[in-house]
Regions:
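N-terminal leader/signal peptides at the extreme start of proteins
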Residues: 1-13
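Extended hydrophobic/Leu-rich segments
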Residues: 4, 21-24, 123, 257
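Beta-strand/loop motifs with alternating small/hydrophobic and polar/acidic residues, enriched
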Residues: 18, 34-172
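N-terminal single-pass transmembrane signal-anchor helix
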Residues: 11-38
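Intrinsically disordered, low-complexity regions enriched in Pro/Ser/Thr/Gly and acidic residues
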Residues: 112-314, 329-333
Length: 333
């Protein structure tokens, strides 16, 4: 018994439909590839960059709020009236929302640490012919860490009245703290501020959090009559931003005093010794601990009567209670 086997019949319409489907898939995959590999990285890079610039401005607003409270306290003291504390708040954006489906958000971490970035000021002065020693300190920082995936990862921090911007290849102070040097008749008039932050908290995400501040203590002291061998010490220990402080303070002193000296630099150390002739006027140094990644910055200003002496040292103190969102442990007074 013979069985009939029919030949397969060619159908040009079926071939065209298959080819069309494949081409449509290729176009879709190409378009999807362009979005994932080109559009999303550019979009996220711009978003993360814009976020860092906005956060820098927000930290500047936070500093401005504290500075205004200190000015109000000074005005109240000068007028002999009681300063009523006020609480100010500044909104800070933590991170960046991603592109739905194609990219996840970039979270940031905002941390308030009352023990970070300690500053110490020490010197001797004369009162009624007796030598007295002064030693003051302050600490505390608010830091935003943005582990950007497309833009350069950065940190923005506020410590002792300064706003810093930090990344792996550099750091600098963007908003200056209170530190000034005046030169008159071969004598130096120096002003500096110590600002302590109280409270402890940390929050992570892409939300916008309120950072509140309340100045609860403020005072200003003026010192004069320094011993002929007096040294004014300003030390900044265990800070990620010690190199920024080194450059800022050295530049401030150099712009006013206009002295030559000796500059040395290694992979872990940077130092400048300013001299007037053979006499050392100031010595500033920044040293990196490679284990912790933290700097120690030391500044010593020497009293050299008749050459470049110390006439006045004005030291301002401020204590500020800070709150970060709802995650802050308050300090009771």
């Amino acid at each position: 018994m013979r069985r009939l086997i029919r030949d397969l019949r060619s159908d040009e319409r079926g071939v065209a439909s298959t080819v069309g489907t494949i081409m449509a898939l290729l176009v879709f995959l190409t378009f999807l590839s362009v979005i994932v590999n080109q559009y999303v990285p550019i979009w996220m890079t711009d978003s993360e960059s814009s976020h860092m610039n906005a956060a820098l401005g927000q930290f500047g607003g936070f500093k401005g709020a504290i500075d205004l409270q200190m000015l109000a306290a000074q005005a109240a003291q000068d007028a002999g009236t009681f300063n009523i504390p006020v609480t100010t708040s500044t909104a800070i954006s933590l991170g960046v929302d991603g592109v739905p489906i194609f990219s996840s958000p970039t979270p940031g971490t905002l941390e308030l640490n009352p023990d970070a970035a300690p500053f110490t000021v020490a010197f001797d002065y004369l009162i009624n012919g007796q030598r007295r020693s002064v030693a003051d300190q302050a600490s505390g920082s608010v830091e935003l860490t943005a582990a950007n995936r497309y833009y350069t990862p950065q940190r923005i921090a506020y410590e002792n009245g300064a706003v810093m911007r930090y990344q792996t290849d550099g750091q600098f102070i963007r908003v200056h703290p209170t530190f000034s040097v005046l030169l008159s008749n071969k004598t130096m008039d120096i002003s500096f501020a110590l600002l302590s932050l109280y409270g402890k908290g940390i929050v992570t995400g892409t939300t916008t959090e309120l950072v509140s501040s309340e100045l609860f203590a403020w005072d200003r002291q003026e010192y004069t009559n320094f011993p002929s061998n007096a040294v004014l010490w300003v030390n900044h220990t265990a800070s990620r931003y010690g190199l920024s402080w080194f450059r800022f303070m050295n530049q401030t002193l150099a712009d006013t005093l206009k002295l030559g000296g000796t500059y040395t630099r290694t992979s872990l150390d940077e130092r400048f010794i300013a001299k007037s002739g053979a006499v050392t006027v100031y010595d500033i140094r920044s040293t990196l601990n490679p284990t912790t990644g933290l700097y120690i910055m030391r500044l010593s200003i020497y009293n050299n009567p008749g050459i470049m002496g110390l006439s006045y040292f004005r030291l301002q103190h401020a204590q500020v209670q800070v709150s970060v969102g709802d995650a802050t442990t308050q300090v009771k007074f």
